[in-house]
A protein has these predicted regions:
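Glycine-rich phosphate-binding loops of nucleotide-dependent enzymes
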Residues: 1-172
Length: 172
């Protein structure tokens, strides 16, 4: 059986700085991995490559045995979601709006907001946030709750595999 994710000889440079060089990584079904290292060691860069935010300068990525093209849309389509260390949220928007922004499936160009809201309410309940309205402004939440919203966003988008970037920064 093929690994869920296989990265081969991944290299990424930013000008003269080499962030990742020749990195090999394999993730099999049921495994959990942690990338541990000093600030600036290239952990976030490697995750952003897997998520499709950065294209590597060298190497290949396979998901479920198929070589991937790079890009966030491709990663989401293949079930890879990322929870960023810096929130990807717009303060003046609601929880639901922040989660579906740019990602909600649309029929005939329209978002089924009611269905999206119901799915988000179920995810809020799953994360112990049943008292929080999906219509609440995102900036009314504390930092830990906002981090949970980032995880909920990845699950809402159908992420099978989740990349958590410095999640412990917000967990107290």
């Amino acid at each position: 059986m093929d690994p869920i994710v296989r990265m081969e000889s991944i290299t990424k440079r930013f000008g003269a700085l080499t962030a990742n060089e020749g990195i090999d990584f394999t993730l099999n079904q049921g495994e959990t991995h942690a990338l541990v290292g000093e600030n600036g060691a290239g952990k976030t860069t490697l995750m952003r490559i897997l998520y499709g935010q950065y294209a590597p300068d060298g190497g290949r990525i396979f998901i479920d045995g198929e070589q991937c093209a790079y890009g966030v849309a491709g990663a989401l389509k293949r079930g890879i979601g990322m929870v960023h260390q810096n929130f990807m949220q717009i303060d003046r928007m609601s929880i639901t709006e922040n989660i579906i922004l740019g990602h909600a499936p649309a029929a005939a160009g329209f978002v089924d907001y009611r269905a999206a809201r119901a799915k988000i309410r179920a995810l809020l309940t799953r994360f112990g946030m049943q008292k929080v309205s999906p219509d609440a402004p995102i900036d009314s939440l504390c930092v830990g709750e906002r981090q949970k919203i980032e995880i909920i966003k990845a699950l809402y988008l159908g992420a099978r595999e989740r990349l958590l970037d410095l999640l412990s920064n917000y967990c107290g």
